[in-house]
Amino acid sequence: MRAAGTLLAFCCLVLSTTGGPSPDTCSQDLNSRVKPGFPKTIKTNDPGVLQAARYSVEKFNNCTNDMFLFKESRITRALVQIVKGLKYMLEVEIGRTTCKKNQHLRLDDCDFQTNHTLKQTLSCYSEVWVVPWLQHFEVPVLRCH
């Protein structure tokens, strides 16, 4: 116990005489833009966000029995987190298009439904995990209502 008290006193003495860690060291850490493990708000028009939103829509289209394809109409919120790749957390509005699933068209070429009986918009929350160096993506969470 006495050795621990001596060590504590020595550390306090050193820090008080040296002034502790330099302010530059602390400010570099605090000013870091993205810290591993912490979600950070990102612009909704960021290319990575747009691609992650498209992955979400593709998963939605593959999981539903709707005869028409949906595509993203608006990304309302986007977060990114560094976790063995990038994890995007997105709030996206998706809309039914005029393209039928069996037509295999590019989603960018599909217009949104204007027919009131066929028009449908859903709000979705998705998490998309992207590992760029492995060209791997996964959509573990997708909820639409």
Curated annotation (Swiss-Prot):
SMART domains: CY. The gene is CST7. Homodimer; disulfide-linked. Residues 1-19 form the signal peptide. Keywords: Cytoplasm, Disulfide bond, Glycoprotein, Protease inhibitor, Secreted, Signal, Thiol protease inhibitor. InterPro entries: Cystatin-F, Cystatin_dom, Cystatin_sf. This is Cystatin-F. It is found in: Secreted; Cytoplasm. Primarily expressed in peripheral blood cells and spleen. A motif (Secondary area of contact) lies at residues 81-85. GO terms for cellular component: cytoplasmic vesicle; endoplasmic reticulum; endosome; extracellular space; Golgi apparatus; late endosome; lysosome; multivesicular body. GO terms for molecular function: cysteine-type endopeptidase inhibitor activity; endopeptidase inhibitor activity; peptidase inhibitor activity; protease binding; protein homodimerization activity. GO terms for biological process: immune response; lysosomal protein catabolic process; negative regulation of microglial cell activation; positive regulation of myelination; regulation of antigen processing and presentation. Belongs to the cystatin family. Inhibits papain and cathepsin L but with affinities lower than other cystatins. May play a role in immune regulation through inhibition of a unique target in the hematopoietic system.
